[in-house]
Amino acid sequence: MVWFKMMSAIEWAEKYRPRTLGDVVGNRKAVQDLRKWAEEWQSGIPEKRAVILYGPAGIGKTSSAHALAGDMEWEVIELNASDQRTAGVIEKIAGSAASMNTFFGGKRLIILDEADNLHGTADRGGMRAISGIIKSTLQPIILIANDIYGLTPTVRNICLEIKFGSVQSRSMVPALKKVCESEGVSCSQEAVLQIAENAGGDFRSAINDLQAAANGKKALEAEDISTAGRDVKENIFKAMQKIFKSTDCKRALESAYGLDESPEDLVHWIDENLPIQYARKDGDLEDIKTGFGYLSKADIYLGRVKKRQNYRMWRYASMLMVCGAALSKTRPYPGFIKYQQPSLWRRLGQTRSRRDMRDNIASKIGEHSFESMHYSRNNLLGFYSILLKDEASAVELTANLGLELEELMYLSGSAKVSKKLQKIYDEAQNLLETKRDRTEEQEFFKAPAPAADDKQATLHCPVNIPEKEGNASAEKPESPGPQSPERKQKTLDLGFDTPQKLPEKKRSSEMKLPENPEPAENNLFSLSEPLPEKGPIPDFAGKKSLPELEEEKPSLSPLKKMSPANKEASKQGVKQGASEKGSPAADTQGGMEDGSKKAEPKNQKTLFDF
């Protein structure tokens, strides 16, 4: 047997991978069928352009595909589970490779490993793309799968199926001895045989166990090998055979517990194959009736598991379905039976696209009618199907729901696109385009017009602040208001739309206040006129003095005005009362009459204290 070596740092399973089909251990019949299919490509395109290699893991399926490429001198393009295998990726890589010849005119082998694991969002549409590529490929394609039923019936029907079985222990022993010799490890016959038996038909696992046992050793004996064995999952078809052929409930349950199947899945397998196994030529259905009686009771427990979320009831359901199927027969049923995959799963796979479309339509109807998708699917789909029969309302209904042409076909119950449906769909698209243009136009006119200047116009109120003498050269912040040649102004921003930064306060040492500022209640001057630096307050109220303005104020009583005599008497009374109390009110009043000095009120803030 020819083996090739690579770097010693890698695993032995990779280091001693077979280079040709003659190096493959076991499965001689499968290898011969694979070679025969490859030779048909030498004379043209065969009837089956793709082949499916299926069987348990670790028995040489992928190695056989690469060994075939080595024998035929084909280039290899491989996609495995670590790659994203959506429809777009498969069509881009495998599709382009399958439709073009190589530069030198040879063949190119396309290998899709773990093809039965095309599930989920990451591989959406991958199986459909594979089916389309196989039908039109100009290059050989090999699909590798552990479970043949993980592939769709469409793919299986257009491919050649080649089954790889578990490798027998006696076939592994010579190959394992060859590996020991190449690595310089002395292995006894008993040790190698023990490793082969513990592998459970998985040759790759046997090589890995040999490498682990021989690590750091020059000799390997049977005592160095663990006898625990591997936890090998039971094959579903072998388990079905043990369940239906057995008359021992315990043995049947052990086969069921070794399966990688839940009781919800196992009940469908038994339901599908029980009438096939217990079918009698004389037409007696008593065994089938008894078996389905136990199966119905098991289904009741499975329903309680879902309803109560009590998974301990799985034990009772498994016992009823397995033991009931095994013990319901009244006589043995010899002969080979080809067990079938549950037909319910096949029907669900075939109708998956239609169920997805139904749910999508129900979701659109629920959004439009403010109902849940479940309610719309069960109660409103038929009603909307009736509405679509009227062509006038069908156009608006299609536009409002946003239905696609395939969804329109589903609601109308049509298997193909008719002229009527195409017309409804086209008019609905035109209606949507018109509504879209109208909405954009309304949004355009609702939008505010852009400002002429980047800075919005704001209300400015100039306030004159006297400069400190001898500090005329000090820098002042610029103001958008008008500037006086004698004094610079600071403006107070009173804009309401976009608040502006307020001017910095002047320190008290930089401000020169008037000697006699007017109290706040008498400040009637306009803020837009400059303040005097010295001297009396100018006349800001239409050329009238404050005493004259006081006389024009309305009296407290609207019925009677104070006469000049009463006014003079009131002033004299104020003077007399102030003099009796020793208050300087008389001096203050006198100062107000002659327009001279005015007393500054205590604790009274002026305009400059902002």
Swiss-Prot record:
Residues 467-478, 502-515, 594-603 have a biased composition (Basic and acidic residues). It comes from the Archaea. Gene3D superfamilies: 1.10.8.60, P-loop containing nucleotide triphosphate hydrolases. GO terms for molecular function: ATP binding; ATP hydrolysis activity; DNA clamp loader activity. Residues 467-610 are annotated as: Disordered. Belongs to the activator 1 small subunits family. RfcL subfamily. Pfam families: AAA, RCF1-5-like_lid. One of its GO terms (biological process) is DNA replication. Part of the RFC clamp loader complex which loads the PCNA sliding clamp onto DNA. Heteromultimer composed of small subunits (RfcS) and large subunits (RfcL). Keywords: ATP-binding, DNA replication, Nucleotide-binding. This is Replication factor C large subunit. The keyword ATP-binding applies. ATP binds at residues 55-62.
